[in-house]
């Protein structure tokens, strides 16, 4: 298959290296699309795989088109060609691409257009010189609609596109063969063996042909439908009257005894072919497949066979048939008036005695309404069945109507409780508009009961469904308007439930944005708290169910609500973090899928919560200036010496020495601080270009020399002050010397003690460092 997201455009070799064309002769569906419709192309391929094989579907991106692909990939051989019309297709529609599309889409019977993000296909047909195609679908249809259209095209037979299936060389050599007898033989040999039309009755008396019914396998979409009768020496065409979408009826033509071919033409194209027989009256009476009295009823064997065939077809093809209002039909007024003699298929079954078909139809949606319909003469199902002598079928209708009229309310209450419990505990809560599908599922599950009880139970279910369908259309439309965006309001799709969707996909892809709605999309909010949406949706659905609940069930529902409230209170006590899901934070989208689990279970959902970031303080206090490490070391040493002195000498330290040690260290620190500030100022001036490097070095040298001179003067003044203070108290000095001599007999110890106290005053400031060596012109921080 063709890779949908190809890396290069217009690269023919890359396309064929991956196997663009499907293998073999399987050429059923050709999908043409642009880049913005790529997801829809993949989505349609998954749908069409229910009808044809995957290898028979070709995805062809138009941004990589080439004229050589027409012959190499044999696009003409595909039975169905589907073009996705999108905004990108109209924007990139060059003359070459227009010519390319005209060659592919020139046929009318097997081309389908899909409107993807477009309101109309008029702009597309204005750019291309091709007739408008009669097959047009939109993204709003359901998958069954797509499959129905594709099946009709694939089942048309080769006659609709024979002109493109014949090779070009053969057509050039034998131009008259394509429209002559040889073409007719090819059509006859290629005509499908499975009949697509059934004409009843199969044998028609020559004297009184009566009326015939034409049952089509698929609905024909066209303006003109004609029936052609062909015998050995006679040909006749007539237009039938429409009974419903797939059934037509007309008066049988007069033909002699023998076989007659019946061709169904739609807009001049043969859609189906079958064969009937004309016979004499005596032979028709003896035949078990023919009506003995055409005006009254069929023979018993023919009725049973027809009943079994129709019932099996309905159960297999349309098991969930739904009766609709007669006013909803879009038939012409003339045909509607003519066909109201038998308004529904149920009335038709009552007339001809089709018991099995009637039992199946009574189980379908809307059977109660259809059973109460009356024909134009005022007769209902009971009168029709009685008039034609079908007493057994009349009893079935009587039981059905009586059970629906006086049915037991307990079953309906049980059903309502099931719906309420489903809406309360289901992880995927459907909208009120989709509860009609829920009723269908409930009814389908009941079909699996035992055969003797099947008809009675399904009649009661139909009665309950009919009573619940009594809501006004306005209320239903208002409920549906609240659920426009299905992808927002259905956060979890229950794929394990009793879903009757025949396809494996969950939802169609999103549509590409329209050019005119870009501004409006920006105005709409794009972010919604999924937890809040789920709670609001469940609350609205619960209110809708409460309106439909009968007074008898309100007491039970109130008790259930009290139990649920008690459970919620327990959950709130056990789960202190449960409120975090409803807040507008970054965990709303993560925890939305687990909101129902939080409600149904008692465990806190905090175990599945990702770790929260460490909270940061709103106000960080400024860091206090700490004492330099070197100063702390000297302070600890001084304190240790002081404690040792108190221990050994038992005399207090001299206060002058403590006071004299203080200015020594801060002076060095202040010197470094002021030196750094001076260096910073000089660096800024050099960067700004106000001063050169040499000038900055010279100025820093002068400043350093000046600072050294000031320090020397200060040290000298401090020394003089100390000498003056010590000289005024000679007796303290003598006592101190005596004490030191007694406790320190060793002269070295006394000498060291004197050196300890005298070192701060005798030490000189360290020599000036080489500024140019370390920083160029900056001072080194560590001495």
From Swiss-Prot:
Keywords: ANK repeat, B-cell activation, Phosphoprotein, Repeat. It holds the Pfam family DBB. Residues 422-521, 538-586, 604-624, 641-670 are annotated as: Disordered. Residues 444-479, 549-565, 641-660 have a biased composition (Basic and acidic residues). Residues 566-586 have a biased composition (Acidic residues). Residues 505-515, 610-620 have a biased composition (Pro residues). GO terms for cellular component: perinuclear region of cytoplasm. The modification Phosphotyrosine is found at residue 649. PROSITE patterns: ANK_REP_REGION, DBB, TIR. Residues 25-153 form the TIR domain. Residues 1-154 are annotated as: Interaction with ITPR2. Specifically expressed in spleen. Highly expressed in immature B-cells and recirculating B-cells, and at low levels in pro-B and pre-B cells. Residues 199-326 form the DBB domain. One of its GO terms (biological process) is response to bacterium. ANK repeats lie at residues 341-370, 377-407. InterPro entries: B-cell_PI3K-Signaling_Adptrs, DBB_domain, PIK3AP1_TIR, TIR_dom, Toll_tir_struct_dom_sf. GO terms for molecular function: phospholipase binding; protease binding; protein tyrosine kinase binding; signaling adaptor activity; signaling receptor binding. Phosphorylated on tyrosines upon BCR activation. Interacts with LYN, ITPR1 and ITPR2. PANTHER family: B-CELL SCAFFOLD PROTEIN WITH ANKYRIN REPEATS, BANK1/PIK3AP1 FAMILY MEMBER. Involved in B-cell receptor (BCR)-induced Ca(2+) mobilization from intracellular stores. Promotes Lyn-mediated phosphorylation of IP3 receptors 1 and 2. This is B-cell scaffold protein with ankyrin repeats. It comes from Mus musculus (Mouse).
């Amino acid at each position: 298959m063709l890779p949908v997201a190809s890396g290069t455009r217009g690269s023919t070799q890359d396309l064929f290296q991956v196997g663009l064309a499907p293998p073999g002769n399987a050429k059923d569906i050709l999908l043409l699309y642009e880049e913005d419709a790529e997801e829809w192309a993949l989505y349609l391929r998954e749908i069409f795989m229910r009808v044809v094989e995957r290898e028979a579907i070709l995805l062809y991106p138009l941004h990589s088109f080439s004229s050589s692909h027409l012959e190499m990939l044999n696009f003409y051989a595909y039975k169905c060609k589907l073009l996705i019309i999108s905004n990108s297709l109209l924007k990139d529609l060059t003359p070459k691409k227009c010519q390319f599309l005209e060659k592919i889409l020139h046929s009318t019977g097997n081309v389908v257009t899909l409107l993807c993000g477009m309101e109309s296909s008029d702009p597309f047909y204005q750019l291309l010189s091709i007739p408008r195609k009669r097959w047009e679908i939109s993204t709003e249809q359901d998958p069954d609609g797509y499959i129905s259209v594709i099946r009709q095209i694939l089942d048309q037979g080769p006659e609709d596109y024979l002109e493109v299936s014949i090779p070009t060389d053969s057509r050039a050599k034998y131009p008259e063969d394509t429209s002559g007898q040889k073409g007719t033989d090819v059509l006859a040999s290629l005509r499908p063996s499975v009949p697509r039309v059934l004409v009843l009755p199969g044998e028609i008396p020559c004297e009184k042909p009566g009326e015939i019914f034409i049952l089509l396998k698929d609905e024909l979409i066209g303006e003109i439908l004609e029936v052609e009768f062909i015998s050995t020496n006679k040909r006749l065409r007539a237009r039938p009257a429409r009974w419903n979408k797939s059934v037509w009826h007309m008066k049988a033509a007069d033909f002699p005894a023998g076989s007659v071919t019946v061709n169904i033409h739609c807009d001049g194209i043969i859609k189906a072919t079958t064969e009937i027989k004309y016979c004499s009256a005596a032979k028709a009476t003896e035949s078990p497949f023919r009506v003995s009295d055409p005006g009254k009823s069929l023979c018993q064997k023919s009725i049973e066979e027809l009943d079994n065939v129709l019932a099996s077809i309905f159960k297999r093809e349309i098991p969930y048939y739904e009766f609709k209002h007669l006013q909803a039909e879009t038939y012409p007024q003339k045909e509607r008036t003519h066909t109201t003699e038998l308004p529904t298929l149920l009335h038709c079954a009552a007339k001809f005695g089709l018991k099995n078909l009637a039992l199946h139809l009574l189980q379908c949606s809307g059977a109660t309404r259809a059973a109460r319909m009356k024909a134009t003469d005022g007769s209902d199902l009971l009168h029709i069945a009685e008039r034609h002598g079908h007493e057994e079928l009349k009893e079935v209708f009587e039981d059905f109507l009586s059970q629906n009229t006086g049915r037991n309310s307990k079953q309906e209450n049980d059903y309502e409780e099931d719906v309420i419990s489903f809406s309360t505990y289901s992880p995927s809560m459907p909208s009120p508009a989709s509860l009609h599908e829920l009723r269908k599922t409930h009814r389908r599950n009941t079909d699996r009961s035992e055969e003797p009880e099947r008809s009675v139970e399904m009649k009661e279910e139909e009665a309950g469904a009919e009573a619940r369908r009594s809501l006004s259309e306005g209320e239903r439309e208002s409920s549906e308007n609240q659920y426009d965006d299905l992808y927002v309001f259905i956060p979890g799709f229950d794929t394990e439930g009793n879903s009757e969707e025949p396809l494996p996909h969950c939802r169609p892809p999103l549509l590409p944005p329209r050019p005119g709605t870009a501004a409006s999309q920006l105005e709409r909010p794009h972010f919604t708290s999924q937890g809040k949406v789920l709670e609001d949706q469940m609350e609205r659905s619960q209110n809708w169910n409460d309106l439909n609940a009968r007074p008898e069930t309100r007491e039970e529902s109130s008790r259930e609500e009290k139990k649920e409230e008690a459970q919620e209170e327990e959950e709130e006590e056990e789960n202190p973090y449960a409120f975090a899901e409803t807040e507008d934070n970054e965990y709303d989208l993560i925890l939305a899928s687990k909101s129902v689990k939080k409600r149904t279970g008692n465990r806190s959902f905090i175990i599945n919560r990702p770790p929260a970031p460490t909270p940061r303080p709103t106000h960080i206090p400024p860091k206090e200036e700490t004492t330099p490490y070197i100063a702390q070391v000297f302070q600890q040493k001084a304190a240790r010496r002081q404690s040792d002195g108190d221990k050994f000498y038992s005399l207090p330290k001299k206060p002058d020495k403590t006071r004299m040690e203080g200015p020594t260290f801060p002076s060095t620190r202040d010197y470094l601080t002021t030196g750094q500030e001076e260096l910073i100022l000089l660096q800024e001036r050099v960067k700004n270009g106000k001063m050169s490097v040499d000038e900055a070095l010279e100025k820093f040298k002068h400043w350093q020399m000046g600072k050294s001179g000031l320090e020397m003067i200060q040290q000298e003044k401090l020394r003089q002050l100390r000498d003056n203070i010590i000289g005024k108290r000679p007796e303290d000095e003598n006592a101190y010397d005596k004490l030191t001599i007694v406790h320190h007999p060793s002269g070295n110890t006394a000498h060291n003690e004197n050196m300890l106290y005298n070192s701060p005053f005798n030490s000189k400031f360290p020599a000036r460092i080489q500024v140019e060596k370390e920083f160029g012109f900056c001072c080194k921080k560590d001495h």
